Every structure is written in C-alpha cells, then in structure tokens.
C-alpha cells in the first residue's frame, strides 16, 4: 500500500507526531482523558493509584500517572525503549525525566 510505504520511508512528522495531551484549549473536565491546564493527571477513575481523583493532582511522591515512559507512577529509566524503530529510524527512548516518549528523529 502506497500510504504505508510513504509513512515508513518518509516518516512525516506532521502526520506521525501525536499532539501533547497538554496542548488543549478546552475547559478542564474530569475523566475526559485530556490533561488540561491546572490538572497534573486525568482524574476520571478513582482506581488510578497515581492520581488523586478529588483534586486531579498526582498523589504525594508520585511522578506520573500515565504515558509510555510511566510505570507504576514513576518515570522509566533513561534509555528504556518506549517506541520501537520504524523503517530506518532508531528506537525512541525515555529520558528518565518525563512520562512522554520523545521521538528521537535520527536515522539508524
């Protein structure tokens, strides 16, 4: 399929980059799976062990509530693969400082 070949060969960032969950302009709403201004985590599910459902803030001592580089409320170690390589691109790895999985943008 030409579309899949294009994505693999060209790796177009305008299509493949997922917007940050913090890049929203809506009014904060609990449980909408978005991280609007004033929220540290989406507090829709009281069962989330990382997020206080009453305040939408991380529980004391926790670093993150979700993300490809978040495991059990902690940032994954620097260098942990969060997205395997596609085509000629290298693996994307965690920074150890964030729950987000940054695209490295380098060819292998």
UniProtKB/Swiss-Prot annotation:
Organ and tissue specificity: Expressed by the venom gland.
Species of origin: Gloydius brevicauda (Korean slamosa snake)
Assembly information from the UniProt record: Monomeric (disintegrin).
Subcellular location: Secreted
GO CC term, one of those recorded: extracellular region
Taxonomic lineage of the native organism: Eukaryota, Metazoa, Chordata, Craniata, Vertebrata
Co-factor(s): Zn(2+)
Entry similarity comment: Belongs to the venom metalloproteinase (M12B) family. P-II subfamily. P-IIa sub-subfamily.
Propeptide residues according to the Swiss-Prot or TrEMBL record: 20-35
Stretch forming the signal peptide: none
Name used for this protein in its record: Zinc metalloproteinase/disintegrin
EC number: 3.4.24.-
């Amino acid at each position: 399929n030409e579309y899949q070949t294009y994505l693999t060969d060209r790796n177009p960032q305008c299509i493949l980059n997922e917007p940050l969950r913090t890049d929203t302009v809506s009014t904060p709403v609990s449980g909408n799976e978005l991280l609007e201004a004033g929220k540290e985590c989406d507090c829709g599910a009281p069962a989330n062990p990382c997020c206080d459902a009453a305040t939408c803030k991380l529980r004391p001592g926790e670093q993150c509530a979700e993300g490809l580089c978040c495991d059990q409320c902690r940032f994954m170690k620097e260098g942990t693969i969060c997205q395997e390589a596609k085509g000629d691109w290298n693996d994307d790895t965690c920074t150890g400082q964030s729950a987000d999985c940054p695209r490295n943008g380098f060819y292998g």
